[in-house]
Regions:
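Substrate-recognition/cap regions that form aromatic- and gly/pro-loop-enriched pockets
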Residues: 1-109
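Activity-critical C-terminal alpha-helical subdomain
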Residues: 93-138
Length: 138
């Protein structure tokens, strides 16, 4: 029962790829932030990646790190911190865990412009859309 672990408000997940050469530095920043905020992630997963995908593929060289946070009074600060981190270091976010994705984050994917162009060709009349596609303007 998720309510038992996270309460009725639930949780949110943040997941992104950190390039190998920035991993230690960014991990220290995250640790310092969480300590300062006196908050913690109930679940953390770190995986090694070394492949390159196509378009908006989440893989890349480095480590993916995923955090689950209970939605509480710290939500805004946590969301702002991770969004700033993604922007500052041009991190690639897992689009299926898209809470912190916005239009500017999408440009961290070198193939985003090509993907956007192909989507507009396939969906020129904008008959198919979602909150996600509206947020990314695709």
């Amino acid at each position: 029962d998720w309510n038992r672990a996270y309460g009725k408000k639930g949780f949110f997940q943040i997941q992104f790829i950190i390039p190998e050469n920035k991993f230690k530095k960014i991990l220290i920043k995250i640790s310092d932030f969480l300590r300062k905020e006196k908050t913690f992630s109930t679940f953390i997963v770190i995986k090694r990646h070394n492949e390159k995908g196509k378009y908006l593929n989440y893989s890349g060289n480095g480590y993916s790190i995923s955090f689950d946070f209970k939605i509480n009074k710290n939500f805004s600060n946590i969301n702002f911190f991770f969004n700033s981190l993604v922007k500052k270091y041009s991190l690639r976010v897992n689009f299926s865990k898209d809470l912190i994705i916005n239009r500017s984050n999408a440009y961290n994917y070198p193939e985003f412009k090509i993907f956007k162009k192909e989507i507009s060709l396939l969906n020129s009349k904008k008959k198919i859309n979602s909150f996600f596609s509206k947020r990314l303007n695709i």
